[in-house]
Each structure stands twice: as C-alpha cells, then as structure tokens.
Amino acid sequence: MGSISHLPAYGHRLLPVLIDEIARDEPDRVLFYTPRNGQPSQGYDEVNTKIFANSINRLCGWLDSQLGSPAGPRTIAYIGQNDLRYFIMMIASTKLGHRLLLSSPRNSVEGHVSLIKQSGCEFWIASSGLDHHEFLQDLQIPSVEAPELPQLLDPTPVKPYVYQKSWNEGKSDVLALLHTSGSTGLPKLVPVYLETAATVDGFHLMEPTNGKRPTGVEWTGTRQLCAMPLFHVAGICLGLYSAVFFNWTVVLPSVGPIMQHVIEDALDHISLDSAFISPSVLQDISKSPRVLEKLSKLKFITSAGGPIPQSVGDLIHPRVPIMQTMGMTEGQWLASVVTHPDEWAYYYFHPRTGVEMRPYSEDLSELVFVQNPKLSATQPVFKTFPELDIWETKDLYSRHPKHPDLWKYEMRRDDLIILSNGEKFNPLAAEGKLISHPWIAAAYLTGRGRFQTAALLYPDENSLDKSDDIITDNVWPTFEEVNKSLPAFAQIHRDFVKIVRTPFPRTPKGTLARNETEKAFTADINAIYDRSTHGKPSVHINGTTEDVVRSGIREAIETVSGLVDLKDDDNIFTRGFDSLHVIRLAGLLSSAFDQPLEVEAGTIYTNPTISQLAHTVWSHLEHGPQDKVHHSEVTREMLAKYAQAFEPPREAKEHIVLTGTTGEIGSYLLDVLCNNDKVAKVWCLNRSADAFQRQVDSAKSKGLSSSWKSKAKFVRYDVASENLGLSQDGLEEIKNEATAIIHNAWEVNFNLPLSSFEPQFIGLKSLVDVCRESRQKIRFFFVSSISAAMNWPSDLLGPVPEASIPRFDAPINGYGSSKLVAEHLLSKAARSGVLSLSILRVGQVAGPVKTLGEGSIWTRRDWVPAIIDASAHLRALPLDLGSASILDWIPIDLLTEVIGQLVVPVNPVVGQENYYNLLNPRTPSWTDSLPGLKARLEASFSDTFEIIPLQEWISRLRGAEKTIVKEVSEGSSETAIRAQSGLKLLAFFEMLASGKEGSRGLEWAKANTLAQSSFLACMEPVSSAWFDTWLKQWGY
C-alpha cells in the first residue's frame, strides 16, 4: 500500500485522498451550499471540507452495514433526488472499492435494465420518494432506501475510512459508471476512473493562452449555482471537480426537476457570482423579464449540453456575460479558454487538449481527439478508451469568420435531417427560432427519409388551452421568417405543422432526445404526411369542360405555390415551381375530381403550362373514369405537339470569371452574381489554397448565401505565373465558356510606389491573353479607383470624365497610378478588338446597410471608422473632413448591386470601351451628419463631445499619442486601443486638411453611369440612419 504523506502533482491527485487531505489542512473551507430541506426559501447549509469528508465516512459505514463487511468489490447503483448525496455516494463507494452505477431517473425501464446488465449491478439504492421499480424484483436485485442528506451531514465525527492507495495503485479505480444519453438508442455505459477525473485537475498544468487559463482555473474562487443534474457529467465536473480541484464554492439547486423557478429561487435567497444553467432552461428564462432582471446581478453565466439558440443568447448576453463550457460523458470537461464577451457563442479550445477540427461539410467541421503521449495528463477520453488513438465526437462546429481558432457548436452528426431526395440540412437553428416565439415551448423538425420537412410544436404552458388553429395562425409569421433562412428543399409548408400536447422526451442535460421523440410521436408524424397525401381536397373541379378543368388547375397551382397572375401558356417552372410543389399538386389534383383519377408527378413535368396540363387531364377524363394519367403514348404525343410552341427561346446565360472573391467587395459581388438568374457560372479566382472555406465563413458571417446556388467554382490562381498558374483543363474551360471577366483582385496599399505593383500587370496580361484566345469576345470589367484621377484639375477641365484619363499626373499615389496604367493597358487591348472593356472607378466604399450578419461591418482599418474611434477617445469630432467633406459614399452591399447591374444589364451596352464613375449621385456634407453623430456618441459614453476644426482635431490627436500608447500598454482603456488606428493615419488626415488629396470642388461626370444603373440613379444619400447602422457595427 502507498502513503498519503504528501499530495502528488496536479493531474496525479486521487479524489478520495485529496478530499481527506484538504479536510485535514483546511477544515473550514466551504465546498458547497445546500438548500435546507431542499428549499432555498428555508436558507442554505454550509458544507465545509471537514463535514463533507465526515459524511463520506458515515456513508462508508452505512454501505458496509448494507453490503456486509468486508463486502468485496461489487457494482451498486444509486438513483436519487438531485442533491449532494450523489457526490458523497461516489467517493464513499470508491473508498470501499465498489463500482457505482448512476442511472438517470429519466431512463425508461428498458434503459435501466440495459445498464444493470452492462454493469453487472448487484445492489440498488434509491432516495426516498423514488420508485424502486418492479423490474428489480424480476432481476432479483435487492434494493434499499438511502439515508437522508441531513443524517449524512451530521458533523458528529465517525470512524474514518482511509483510502490508502498510491497514484499507480488507485488511478484505475472507478469513481462512477455513467452512461450516454440514449438519444439515438439504449444508453451505453461509460466508466469514469480516478485517473480520468485527475485529467481535469490537469487544467492546472496548462499554460495561459491569450492571457487566460482554462475556465476551471480561471474561475477559481467563484460562488456558482450548479443548476444541472448531479448524476450527469456536467453536474459532476462543475459541481464536484470544481469545488475540490479549483476551490469554487458550489451552490446546489433545490430538489425536483431543474426549471426556471429553481434558478429564480436561488437568485432570491443566496448571493451568487455565477450560475451554470442548461440551454433549455435559459430558453425559458429568456421569456421572463422578471427572471432576466434577477439574472443580471451575476458576474457571468455558463452553459453546456447543447447550443444556446442565437435568439436566446441575444436576449441574455446584454444583461449578463455568457461564458460557455464544453464537456462530454466520454471526455469529461474539455479545457477551453474564455473568449471575448461578444463571441459568447464560440469556444477556444486549449491547445493541450489535443483536439483537431476535421472538415465534415462545406461549412462544418467535426471535433476529433487525437491521442498524444505528451498530453496524457490532459486527455481524459483516452483514459476512457485507452485502446483508441483517435476518437470522433460526432460534434459539428463552424469556424469563426475572422478568428480561425474560435469554433461555434452547431449540432451532432446524428441531428442532420436527410430527406428522401438526398438533400440534408441542420434543423437546430430553425427550431431555436421557433421556440423564440412566446407561445412555443419546444419545436421538433422531422423529415428523415421523407420528401418534405414537417414540424411538431409543443405550446408554452400559457398557451396550452388555445386551439391548434389559433396557435398555428399566431406562430405562422415566425415560420415565414424561418423559411427565409432554410434552403428551398427544407422549407416548411403550413400543412406540415402539427400542434402536440405531450412534452418531447429530453436527455438528462435537457436537450431534445431526437430518436426518442421520433419514436414517441410516430403516429403524429405519420398523420402529417398521410394528411398531405390523402387529406380532404382544398380544390374541387367538376371536370365538365376543358375550360373548367383549366380554371381548376389554375386554382390548384395557386393553392400549393402561391403563384398568381399566371398566363395559360406560362411555364410554371420558370416562375418558381419546384419539386415539392409538383408532389403537392399531383396529390391535390388526384383528389379534386368527382371521377377517380390519378395524376402523377411526371405528367406535370411533361406538361409545364396550365394549357398543356388542362388539355392532358381533360383528354383522359373524356376517355373514362378509370383512366390513369401517366407517361402513355398519348402524353408523349401531346408533348411533341405542344413542346415547340410553348418552350420559350432560351436566353443566353452569363459565365463570369471573378478574381478576388474572398475580399470585401468580392464577397458581396459573388452573392449578387449568383442570385442573378441570368448567371449560370462564376469562376472564383483566388490566390489562397483555403479560399473556399474562407468564402463560406465570410458569407455566413456577413449574412450572405454560402451555397451560391451551385454556380460558384473555386479556382486557385497565381497572378505572376504563366497562364495564371491554372491547369490546362481549367484554362481551356474558361476560354471555351467565359462570357465576362471581372478583375477585382488588386493589392491595396496607398504607401507603395508604382513599381511595387508590377506583378499586378503581369496578372493583367495573363487575363488579357485569356480574352485573346477565348471562343467569344469577352466583356472585361476592371474594378478601378477614383484615386486614379483625384488630382484631376476640374476647375480647368471640368468634371472627371466617363472616359480615359489622358493626364498621368491625375493619380494621388502609387496605388492610383497603378490603376490608371491598368486602365490604359486595357484600353489598348479593347481598341485592338481583343475584348470589350468597362472601367469601374470605385469611390469611397462604406460599410453595409442592408446585410446585417455578424461579419457585416465597416472594417475598422478604414479611415472613416478611424476618425470615429479617435474622436471617441478625444471626446471631440472634427467640424469638417477637408477635401473629403462631401459624402458621396456608397455602402458596399449597394455598390455590388450597382456593379451587378452593369455586368449583367437588362439592355447590353454597345461599344468597345465604357467608363463608369461609381459615386453616390446625392452628396450631403459631413456637417449634415454631425448633430446625429454627436448625439449618438454622447449617449454611448454619457459624456459631452466637442465639435472643433479638423486641424485642431488633428493636433489634439497628435498630442494624445503618448497617453494612448501608455493606456494601451496598460490595457486600461478600450477607447485608447481603438484610437491607435487614428494615430497610424495622421499623415492622411493632414493631407485631407491641406487639400492635397484633391480639390474640395472635384466633380465627377456620372450621366452614362446613371443611365446604365437605375440602382445607382435611385440611391439614397448618406443619412443618419446609415450612420446609426455603422456606429452600431463599431460598437457605439
């Protein structure tokens, strides 16, 4: 036997030894607060280390009396009220050498029996008030009632039971036998060894990253409510481990199911620093302003067990910081580091966890543990499964659009719904949106193996008495919002919504048990699909004449699709009719006539107009009531007869090469092009190898589509290589198919001389060579810049023309000169007949105002946000912006709409060269926006802001440089950190003030541009509403 004369190092401490050690050395250290008699209103009892260790010894004596002493190692089970007895039972059984099975009270009889058989359980212990189950008698397993908690916590000293094993002798002893949730079948046994628990203690060994330690260590000393089931790994980790390993004080919840009132009771009756609350309970709290207000008293909350719905987090986060935790039964507590408060939905996993994110789909990656001998002390999953080198968690995450080390939990692999057509989608976000409705407590989307998604809704307790129709009517606007975010194949039709009055099965951690829900509600789900196929027809057609049939088919099409104003000869598929509409229309028509008639989907596909379909149906009605409408010879003859007459001439589609899609303009422009029905394909040429993933992440963060309607093809290219570094096949494909090239990629650096841009000209030549060898004349669009002409002498020569710039002194810097040189080179190519040229001179690009994703922001690297950030630190705004005082800015999401209209015009422009000056035609001044800016910033900082001349503002910023640098180094001022960008642009601001950036009266010709872009012609001016949007993006 070993000795306990001293504690081993972190990661090698055995819980039974450690508890006795701290009870001896720190007897008054409070580990837990338990609600007296299980009711917070009666107060809380302190449980210090001495009392806790004594209660374990008392239970050891009781177990010996029940099992016989010495009993020898046995497997025993405990099921009880959600109180401290779980932890006492775990340590006591370990001291005695027994294995303790913790079977969830929510398990079915089948689940309990399965776990008993898997573990070889011989003895069953339950707290009072819990059913001992008849199945125990059938299995001939003796059962007994556990001592009450006050009895165990009696401070009177009892005989000590000393755990005398060394690390090597005790590390393989079982602390508890846990089990999986059984959400995809029967629960599976998962042993937790003392060595497994000690890996959580190994958090102490992990070095700080980004200045933070793993959460368990970082939150040392917190007093936290552990509102989780204590038999579950979440409750054990943040209840037992946190108190013993990390010196937390853990407040235990009241008895009974953990619901909103449990949290409120604790908040009302004990002082707390933080709380550990499941996502399902946070969902309920988000609907209660009263509890939300009480929650705001905490320093932070943490959660685990599933994703917090975005709508729920958005309500809670402004009131109390959310700091998420991640764990799993097989891997215990996964070491993560607290992220920035605004990134509450994301995890930063500590490098010493040894996890990898392996791509699973275009936008999801799976969390995978890879065994590393050097990380043995901090990889618990390989204590659970020592025979494995890799363990796939089946947990899928999405990467942060800007911070590649941050990951957001999205779903389990098993949560994906795969429809009968092979399309698959993630239902969790949609379910989260639905439960944000105040009348809905839970939502479940189904459809695996079916042709259509269906929804089951369980009403909130305050809405249970309302009729199904009233609930559906009230919730339907939320469904319409949900459908906007779902792919077309997954959208939910009103006929596929059912209200249920039985709660959905839940896992112990409170998440939806999807497999059990599917089984429990099989009848309801089948009823939805049966109703859609055999339900009472909502359209009746008497079939007396072909005109009547035609009118009835029109009504049926409107019923299933909402399409109105269809002409008899319109092709329904060009108007948005899809495969789901076809299935529903076939079912509706099959039951709409008085005579028996079966209309197959194929009949609709081969008769895509109202006239064709009506004629086909009418002809078969005429042949007799038993005729079946199918792909018969008659149908083929009818198709041959009408196909040519009704098929509209195909409009040529655009095949576009777009360079630099991962940049700001490129991201929005790709979205615009792919949403244009006249565009068939977009080759996305980028330099980086991971352009596709970056594009997906960027699109998701900006609120843009990341599917691009299957039109986008990502190709890596090298601007300085021959043939752009493309493969021969890739190059030939572009030469054979491309109709247009948009050259958007260009190095942006206003400090470089013209010579530094020479690689750009090499790439430009390669693109022109593609045009020279293409099968058709390419329309070439070059994204230029107004900096190519900012020194244009408009006082002498008038507005900057929509034409080639003949003066080589017009650019303001090397960047502008590079753009001007490119314009002239391309003009030469156009005049030689190689290509048709359009020059797009882009002005000041502002932040987005219509797309509102998390990543849709005006980047702080730009000079306008730099002025705002510096002004926030100075508490002063400049009176003017010098030569930039006229606000002819265009928001980036509107600019790309303009470009899209020019690239894919309604009426193509004739001519070999076209020049467009892309500036807002409506030009308010900076001073017009000052009152709103001043008021917004004063409200944000609760302070007064001055308005001072630009030159004085620059002087103040220069004078504040030392203070800003000092505050940044001390980390004492967020405004100082932001103001740094203004310091870097001081020279630029000086140029604005001196007017060297160009005349204040510089004018730009726009007649041709406005004639070709109605979008630009109707554009709003820069407004206070736009500034409010940008200020919100910047956090003001």
Swiss-Prot record:
The superkingdom listed in its UniProt entry is Eukaryota
O-(pantetheine 4'-phosphoryl)serine PTM positions: 579
What biotechnology does with this protein, per the record, is:
Fusaric acid is phytotoxic to plants such as cotton and banana. It has been shown to induce programmed cell death in plants. In addition to a mild toxicity to animals, fusaric acid exhibits acanthamoebicidal, antioomycete, and antimycobacterial activities.
Q: Which segments carry the region annotation Adenylation (A) domain? A: 21-343
What residue stretches are annotated with the Carrier domain?
544-621
Q: What GO biological process, any one, is recorded here?
A: biosynthetic process
Pfam families to which the protein is assigned, alphabetical: AMP-binding, AMP-binding_C_3, NAD_binding_4, PP-binding
The reply to whether Secreted figures as a keyword in the UniProt entry is: no
Q: Please give one Gene Ontology molecular function term for this protein.
A: transferase activity
Task: Please list where the region (Thioester reductase (TR) domain) is annotated.
Answer: 658-899
Q: Which InterPro entries match?
A: ACP-like_sf, Adenylate-forming_Reductase, AMP-binding_CS, AMP-dep_synth/lig_dom, ANL_N_sf, Far_NAD-bd, NAD(P)-bd_dom_sf, PKS_PP-bd
Which SUPFAM superfamilies does the UniProt entry name for this protein?
Acetyl-CoA synthetase-like, ACP-like, NAD(P)-binding Rossmann-fold domains
Write out the entry's keywords from A to Z: Multifunctional enzyme, NADP, Oxidoreductase, Phosphopantetheine, Phosphoprotein, Transferase
Enzyme class, broadest EC rank: transferase
Pathway listed for it is: Mycotoxin biosynthesis
**Phenotype reported upon loss of the gene:** Impairs the production of fusaric acid.
Its Enzyme Commission number(s) read: 2.3.1.-
State its role: Non-canonical non-ribosomal peptide synthetase; part of the gene cluster that mediates the biosynthesis of fusaric acid, a mycotoxin with low to moderate toxicity to animals and humans, but with high phytotoxic properties. L-aspartate is suggested as fusaric acid amino acid precursor that is activated and further processed to O-acetyl-L-homoserine by cluster enzymes aspartate kinase FUB3 and homoserine O-acetyltransferase FUB5, as well as enzymes of the primary metabolism.
UniProt note: domains: Contains three distinct domains: an adenylation (A) domain that activates the substrate amino acid which is subsequently covalently linked as a thioester (aminoacyl-S-PCP) to the 4'-phosphopantetheine prosthetic group of the second domain, the peptidyl carrier protein (PCP) domain, as well as a thioester reductase (TR) release domain.
What name does this protein carry? Non-canonical non-ribosomal peptide synthetase FUB8
Task: Supply the source organism for this entry.
Answer: Fusarium oxysporum f. sp. lycopersici (strain 4287 / CBS 123668 / FGSC 9935 / NRRL 34936)
